[in-house]
Amino acid sequence: MSAGDLDRRAFIELVGGATAGALVGGRETGTQAGATSLSAAPSWIGPRPPAPAWCDTPMRWAQLVLVENDPGQFDAAFWLDYFKKVHADAACLSAGGIVAYYPTEIPLHHRSAWLGSSDPFGELVRGCRAQGMAVIARTDPHAARDDVAKAHPDWIAVDGDGQPRRHWSNPELWITCALGPYNFEFMTAVHREIVTRYEVDGIFTNRWAPQTDCSCEHCRRNFRAASGRELPRTTDARDPDRRAWLAWRKARLTELWALWDADIRRVRATACYIPNGPPDLATAAVMQPPIQFADHQARRGLTPPWSNGRRAKEYHAVMDGRPVGGIFSVGVEEPHRWKDSVQSEAEIRLWVADGTANGMRPWFAKFAGVLRDRRWLPVVERIYDWHFRHERYLRNTASLASVALLLSEQTTAVHTPPSERPVGDHVAGMYHALVESRVPFDLVHEARLTPERLDRYALVVLANAAALSDAQCDALRAYVRRGGGLVATFESSRYDEQGTRRPDFGLADLFGVRDTGRIDGPMKNAYLTLREDPRTGTRHEILAGLDDAPRVIHGVWRIPVTPLAADAPSPLTLVPTYPDLPMEDVFPRQERTDTREVYVSEPGRGRVVYFPWDVDRVFWEVLSADHLALLAGAVRWASRGVTPVTVTGPGLVEVTAWRQASSMTVHLVNLSNPMMMKGPLRELLPIGAQRVRLTLPPGTRATRVTLLSSGTSPVTTRDGASLTVQVPSILDHEVVAIDLA
């Protein structure tokens, strides 16, 4: 099969036989966009090559994105000196694509109009090599100039009316088709020239995926050959043609990734292709890239700082310990695109700290080689200097988390909650609850639910993981039977991986309920009564922290399930909705019912908590302290309290725990700031003393304990395998480092 023509056989193999079969024959099914996760590399890609040895070495990355008029104006010596000053051991440098920053010999590869006889890319590469740095070349293929459009009009993206697409920001440029010959042939030649001439360690491509839908002749022909369909005329993901197109798009990008990687390795065996973002994480799991970078440069709008750490967890869920870098911007990252701006020091520091605490290696990105605002330079220097001095404690070998939150790309792709709010709100609410409860946790990907992976954890959490396959349900069921804990909410397992509604929950036996097929809501002014066990006269452990509460607020959407056991515990029961206006009518029509709103059970050797309502989503919306207590109690009970570390003290602190070759670390990120939910931070505000109690890895003993940020040796108490460390204060990020013997 040629690199440029993905035929029907390859399409079916890549996206999965069952799903593709529903997409290629013109039959309408319940499958929606991107529902299929790859489980093995397609045969036409071949076995994945080993990771080049250099990939795991760099710990601090520097990226200089040149602009076209930089040649002859920017000071390359300054940047090389700055890379050295910040202890950067790898660089990503602009090379080609839209603009060539070297004397390219490829026709239509636009040389910078300011290039002259210079070679700024080559100068930077040589300077970095002299400093012992790894170097990857940045290319950007998403736009081209008039000469390209005239010579090869078929390389340009076409809109639904058959018109070539101008660039949305710079109308002098044209948007290229990412899935046709421009990438598969022209950019392949560009990459080959760069690697051949400069012997770089890899190619990193920005905006390599389609920037918009394309109706060019290549997309029409290749999509028809792969799927038997015409291009979709709608963006509605429920449309079968649209679903087929999205599956084909993913397959085509995977083919392009494999092509570029193989071609680069043929030129230089120790080099590789690194996409700036895979088609999805399931594809990254199959393609096994030797290194990946999370391009989540800063927060915008209503975004908490833990968002950077979340992106780290997402990549770690599929990277199997291979390195993950975190790209961060030194500017203001908002939709208005102030690319020459400078962000506050406090904001940059906390953003990078949260990524570091979650196992990302920092990568600063600077646009334009000519500096117009130098305020960020000492900020990055301070961050990188700290990182360099403590590198051996940041080269992690394993997460020590005992809780995992399920990452379900299937649910995101195929499921729309009844609230019509983003399905991600459920995950965000659960994520925030775990962070606020100071629970160290990982993300585990739905395509990787093997016993080996699941059994690392005492608990797996399903935050409305609505779309799960039978095999995924079986894996979770077996995990619980082996002794694992499970916390699940709302519609978890109600649909299969294609988004088709099941007659009953896929995990009904674990939840202890039967699906009635209904959903109630949106509810207003509904409540939950906290009940004692009539046999013991005490409340269930999941209600810990709510001792003085007779009732708490309910959610907005609930499933009226039928219990499988009449004598199951009933810690929470329904108080049905009643009027909230006029005020004279605001009284409950039923003070209490026996309708259970949480199901707790101990099937096999495991423990299960199931909330048949949207507790996680509502928590994200209103941040009720009572809902936080419910979620924290469920996690604590279902996990049997197993945790590598317990941290007590004032403030909102994110906690992570890691193992290194001869040490372990506990990261404490201080999120206690009035700008925590809406940046940028104005200043860092210290919080008071924290008590850290941790369990040493089996067969080890602590030889030294250090607080890396304060540079002090804390008061420490040993009790067998347990260690208690007193941390006097945290400004933004403290790391408890324990040397082991």
Predicted regions and their residues:
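N-terminal secretory signal peptides and thylakoid transit peptides that target proteins
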Residues: 2-19
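Glycine-rich, aromatic-flanked loop segments that form ligand/cofactor-binding clefts
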Residues: 61, 90-93, 123-166, 272
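C-terminal segment of N-terminal export signals and the immediately downstream linker at the start
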Residues: 4-5, 25-54
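Aromatic-lined carbohydrate-binding/catalytic grooves of carbohydrate-active enzymes
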Residues: 86-119, 144-155, 284-291
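Active-site-adjacent "subsite" loops/lids of carbohydrate-active enzymes
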Residues: 141-198, 233-246
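Active-site neighborhood of glycoside hydrolase catalytic domains
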Residues: 182-277, 282-283
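Aromatic- and glycine-enriched glycan-recognition loops and surfaces
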Residues: 68-86, 109-131, 255, 425, ...
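Carbohydrate-binding surfaces of carbohydrate-active enzymes
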Residues: 47-49, 135, 238, 242-243, ...
